[in-house]
């Protein structure tokens, strides 16, 4: 009995934590972490750096081009950048590869991945890795890659080239420009997406440092193909992100058209991480897995849902979570019991060992992006 009382006494912490993470959701959503992979080393080795601002960039050890890419990422104000440096392509017989870095990244916390010095093959390998990590490992990793037709909600396919940016002035005070490729500017885009709060979309986000970009004949068709592009509409507003879309173009009943919106995927990932992290911190190994404790956890999740209504969840929708009765029924059948002879409550209360199976329905809110007006005069 004392142990049971102690467990029950500790449960209010879960409610407090869910309420806290709910009220801080927008602020926390603007503090994403970027993982950046760079070819930099002249020896067969991997180094890593944690960069929170420009003062963290080492004075030696990184090439000038790589320092520039890190600074471009910092413009988006991510919480921090986890920089991993690989051998340059000129290092003969190098054994340290991108695969080694991915093994390091697999079990740490970050949000957006970019590799602005990667080869086409390395970009393809990153796309394959993200596609594996999200469904099978239940990770919320995402990547900004260049010209990768990945058809996946976790991968942004950035395709704008000829990105003209003033990077210096000459002795006469005239501007000196650098032309960036799409793969190089994935660093900038990853920084933007990591530092952007969920109270807005990245659509029409201004890149004030960019002077001009390539021009498209039919940008709508390209966006429909899952390409994220920069555009200058020559309206005096400068260069901006045309549409905050990921590379998903194949839609199903499980993944509808809303899954192509970066804001929607970011919201889903934040909810998954918040619930999973709280479960690990307050429940795993600490709470008896009976019906009452399951329902206490359900109540805590509902409190969290109530706190993120508005900018994350649709305030007018019925956002719910409950015991997964289908899982409970299947579990009972697998363990030799006949669920057809059981009442609904008996199925809900069936002992599922160390597993908590919940089912829910939520409606995520998007930012305004399209305007349709029909005037009748």
Predicted features and spans:
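Structured, hydrophobic secondary-structure cores that serve as assembly/anchoring elements
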Residues: 1-69, 74-78, 200, 227, ...
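Acidic, serine/threonine- and glycine-rich low-complexity intrinsically disordered segments
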Residues: 205-222
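Extracellular Cys-Trp
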Residues: 66-204
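Short, surface-exposed beta-edge/turn micro-motifs
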Residues: 31-33, 109-111, 140-141, 225-228
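Long, low-complexity, intrinsically disordered N-terminal extensions of eukaryotic proteins, enriched
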Residues: 170, 210-213, 238
């Amino acid at each position: 009995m004392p142990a049971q009382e102690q467990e029950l006494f500790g449960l209010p912490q879960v409610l407090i934590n869910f309420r806290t993470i709910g009220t801080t959701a927008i602020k926390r959503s603007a503090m994403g972490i970027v993982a950046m992979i760079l070819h930099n080393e002249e020896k067969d080795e991997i180094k890593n750096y944690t960069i929170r601002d420009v003062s963290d960039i080492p004075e030696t050890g990184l090439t000038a081009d790589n320092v520039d890419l890190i600074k471009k990422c910092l413009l988006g104000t991510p919480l921090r950048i986890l920089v991993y440096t690989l051998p340059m392509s000129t290092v003969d017989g190098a054994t340290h590869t991108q695969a080694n870095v991915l093994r390091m990244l697999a079990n740490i916390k970050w949000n957006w991945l970019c590799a602005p010095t990667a080869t086409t093959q390395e970009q393809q390998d990153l796309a394959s890795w993200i596609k594996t990590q999200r469904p099978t490992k239940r990770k919320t990793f995402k990547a900004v890659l260049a010209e990768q037709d990945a058809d996946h909600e976790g991968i942004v396919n950035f395709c704008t080239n000829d990105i003209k940016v003033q990077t210096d002035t000459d002795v006469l005070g005239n501007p000196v420009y650098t032309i960036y490729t799409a793969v190089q500017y994935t660093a900038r885009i990853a920084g933007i997406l990591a530092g952007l709060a969920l109270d807005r979309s990245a659509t029409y986000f201004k890149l004030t440092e960019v002077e001009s970009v390539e021009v498209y004949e039919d940008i709508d068709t390209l966006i429909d193909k899952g390409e994220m592009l920069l555009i200058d509409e020559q309206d005096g507003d400068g260069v901006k992100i045309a549409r905050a879309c990921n590379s998903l173009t194949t839609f199903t009943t499980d993944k509808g058209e809303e899954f192509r919106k970066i804001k929607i995927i970011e919201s889903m990932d934040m909810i998954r991480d918040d619930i999973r992290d709280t479960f690990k911190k307050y429940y795993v190994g600490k709470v008896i897995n009976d019906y009452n404790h399951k329902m206490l956890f359900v109540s805590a999740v509902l409190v969290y849902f109530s706190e993120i209504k508005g900018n994350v969840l649709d305030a007018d929708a019925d956002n719910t979570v409950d015991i997964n009765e289908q899982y409970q029924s299947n579990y009972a059948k697998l363990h030799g019991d006949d669920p057809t002879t059981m009442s609904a409550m008996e199925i809900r209360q069936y002992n599922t060992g160390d597993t908590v199976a919940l089912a829910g329905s939520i409606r995520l809110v998007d930012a305004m992006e399209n305007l349709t007006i029909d005037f009748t005069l």
